[in-house]
């Protein structure tokens, strides 16, 4: 089973396309939506829904995948739920770059500080990060610098921030998922 978390643009038709692409890896792809506006509520909601999906799915090698803001959540929720994660262009600093778009961006700082200390060290090698060299929204070099000590970084030369085409990376994701 693969859990898919959308980015800030929850209504983008690209989300459906990504789900269809991920079904080439596993036919059981679950799209879990969240508000994107209320971080604390989103975290509680995502923990509950992802845990429920894992319990119902019966796949010992479940995976959570997210793009942009969904990548922020995939890394944290996947860690807390004990499943591997794939993050495409994860937005590691929504409190800095989403002011005016979300109600309480400072809640992201609170969430980050309340997460288990050194969670990335404890999560080492359990997240695959795919970054666009042409990310028009985020500084992918900064993201790579923050995550490279803990996770494998795969660079994509063609995609933009929303990462419309996952297909060049599906085999790598499938291999990563089988590691459980």
UniProtKB/Swiss-Prot annotation:
Matching SUPFAM superfamilies: alpha/beta-Hydrolases
Family of this protein: Belongs to the UPF0227 family.
NCBIfam families assigned to the protein according to its UniProt record, in alphabetical order: PRK04940.1 (NF003431)
Protein name stated in the entry: UPF0227 protein YE1706
Species: Yersinia enterocolitica serotype O:8 / biotype 1B (strain NCTC 13174 / 8081)
